[in-house]
Structure formats: structure tokens, C-alpha cells
Amino acid sequence: MLQSIVLSVCMFMLHTVAASGPQSYQKLDFTNVGFTGSYVDVNKFKDITNNESCTCEVGDRVWFSGKNAPLADYLSVHFRGPLKLKQFAFYTSPGFTVNNSRSSSDWNRLAYYESSSKTADNVTFLNHGGEASPCLGNALSYASSNGTGSASEATVLADGTLISSDQEYIIYSNVSCPKSGYDKGCGVYRSGIPAYYGYGGTTKMFLFEFEMPTETEKNSSSIGYYDLPAIWLLNDHIARTSQYPTNANCSCWASGCGEYDIFEAMNGTEKNHLYSTFHTFQGIEDLGTGIQSYGYITRNTTGTMKGGVVFDSSGNVVSFISDATPFNGTVSADTVNDLLAAIPENETYSSQLMSISATAPSTTSKSNGVALTKMQNGVWYYILAIFTAFTQVVLI
């Protein structure tokens, strides 16, 4: 009976919100980000070039906890065309809270790319140009200067490089991984690949200057993401093992090690709407759909966009677009908070993630894993999300 009432209310509110549709914003906020949970990582590859026996084995559960978890781990930065990258910067801070500069510290830039000068500090461009595997897909390789070809060594992306629909490249740091191994710093990864760490820390900021022009090439059935550009973050283990596996055991992604889409065009009917989405199990069962902001950022197809994402120390994650985005070596806490505060409330969409409780066992193994989400938790997440969207529509 209660479930029927809940679903009826959900349908009514969803109909009301859907009638108006998602709105355009300059800033997409998520609060209460981070929970205690676990995922399974790849422990062993087997026969990775054999069509019949290619497979992967997973190890014990890896537990995580705290603000922004599991995205407090090392992350790689991914780009899909049509896109032209002009600047990229990664920052960390000893402590930063959105809207509270008094208790926040400045941001220090630890990685930087600028296209016209070909500056590339602590940046390595990779793509999926390596050896093919029937269960793992293509391995990582160094990207050539055009982003899509392969190179024999680390190469800086050329100025003005435009990648087309479906084409991707990745940015990792220039810090080399230790030897492949389940208990090593980078986990198990494929032999022969250029293996680097991503960018870590609970409190971090990724900034971008970029273009997302309308695709000029003709569409075809071989293009999976036609005119759907994106910038997103993945747990850095994923691409080193398999970003696009045919076997779910060949990547920690399916068990929830972490993805955050900063700016992503989701489908052809909304190709100029850039959404932010969490692909974690923080209150939802459908990892593929994820936890998406109901609002979107408008894609500028004729000019340059500046913006990025802030992961603060208190579990707030903010995607934003602003022409005032700085790329200095040091950015003060006041500068970041003033930039975010300058975006009006009616240009801000806020979502709160669910609180999830789980306790890591004293000894962990695959059999000790717990179900992190229940059906009722998923229902309550949708109620909260729909209610938030309904409230936003009423206030506009």
C-alpha cells in the first residue's frame, strides 16, 4: 500500500516536472557526496588475446570511505569529440569549503596544459590505440599530436587539435606507475602499456578552456556518439585495465569504483545540453544511468567555454561554466568562492545525494561484500531528486 502511494506521488511530481523539462544553468551543485562502500578490482588477466578463453578474475573487495569517496581516489581525465582543448589545469588544496573562504586554503596547480605554447606540465596524453583484446578492448598507448594516432613516446597535443565524434583521448599525470600487481599502487594493468597515475586527493579542482563545435562530418552507423562531446573523470585503474570491456570482471567500473561526468551531451535530442552525472552506488542501483543533475549547462557551439569542477573538503561537488575561470599557478580560496558566488541562484541547480551506511568488515574478501543499496533506497533517491526538481521549477 505504502509503495503504491509513493509511486503515485512520484509519477505526479515527475509529470509536473517533465511538463516544464530540464532548465539551463551555469552551475550544477551536488551536496553530501561520499559514502562508505566497496568495489572489486581486477586481480588477474588470462589469455587476453584469445577469442575463446580471454577472461579476468577479480580480487577481494576494496573498501572506501569519506568525503567524495570513491572519487577521492586517483582519477584520469577523458575527452570525447567534437572537442578542441585549449587549457587544462589540476589543483589541490589542503582544505577548501564552498562558500566558506575563512576556513579554506588556496589552490595549488599541480598539472597544466596550454595549447598555443604547447606547455604540458605533469600531463601525459594517451588514447586507446594499443593492442586489441576480445575481452578487454584496445589497450592504452601514447597519443600522437593530433590526439587520435599512436606515438612511441609522450607527445604534447598540437595547438588547434580538434577531435571528431566518437574520438577520445585521456590525460594522466607524468608520474609512472610501479610494476603491475594487485597490491601495488596502480593495481593490475596490461603489459606494455604506458602506465601513469591519475590525479588524486579528496579536495581537488579540474579546470578547462575548450570548444565543442557542431560536428561537420556526416553521421554513420559506425559512430556511437555522433555530435555528443564530453569531458569526464574515471577511477584511474579503469583505462589501464579496460575502459570498454566485454567482460564486466575486466574493469572495476561495473562494481562502482567511480566515474563523474563533468560536461556530457547525453543523446541526439539534447546534443547541446551538457549534464553532470555521478556513476557511483550512492543511493541508486542503476550505475549506467547514474545520479544525474536535472539541470544542464548549455553547450556553446560557436565559441570558447571555460569552467570545470570543484571537489571540496565537505562533500560538495560543483560543475560550472564561467568566463572568469582562472588558470594561475596559485588560485586563492577567495577567488574560487567569489567566482562561484557570482553565478546567480537562478543559474544554479542543486542536488543532494543520499546518505548511505555500510561498515567495512575487519577482514575483507569477495564473500564479505555487502549490498550497498536496497530497492527502497533507490525509490527514496528518486523521490528526493524529483522533489528537488519540482521545487526548482516552482522557484524559477
UniProtKB/Swiss-Prot annotation:
The lineage of its organism: Eukaryota, Fungi, Dikarya, Ascomycota, Saccharomycotina. Extensively N-glycosylated. Keywords: Cell membrane, Cell wall biogenesis/degradation, Glycoprotein, Glycosidase, GPI-anchor, Hydrolase, Lipoprotein, Membrane, Signal. The keyword Cell wall biogenesis/degradation applies. Glycans are attached at N51, N99, N122, N146, N174, N219, N249, N267, N300, N328, N346. The keyword Cell membrane applies. Residues 369-396 form a propeptide. Induction: Induced in response to cell wall damage and DNA replication stress. It catalyses: Hydrolysis of (1->3)-beta-D-glucosidic linkages in (1->3)-beta-D-glucans. Belongs to the PGA52 family. It is found in: Cell membrane. This is Probable circularly permuted 1,3-beta-glucanase YJL171C. A motif (ExDxxE motif) lies at residues 259-264. Residues 1-19 form the signal peptide. It is an enzyme of class 3 (hydrolase). InterPro entries: YJL171C/Tos1_C (IPR018805), YJL171C/Tos1_N (IPR018807). A lipid is attached at N368 (GPI-anchor amidated asparagine). Present with 5525 molecules/cell in log phase SD medium. It comes from the Eukaryota. Probable circularly permuted 1,3-beta-glucanase involved in cell wall modification through beta-1,3-glucan network alterations such as increased branching or remodeling. PANTHER family: CELL WALL PROTEIN YJL171C, PROTEIN TOS1. GO terms for cellular component: endoplasmic reticulum; fungal-type cell wall; mitochondrion; plasma membrane; side of membrane. Gene3D superfamilies: 2.60.120.200. GO terms for biological process: cell wall organization.
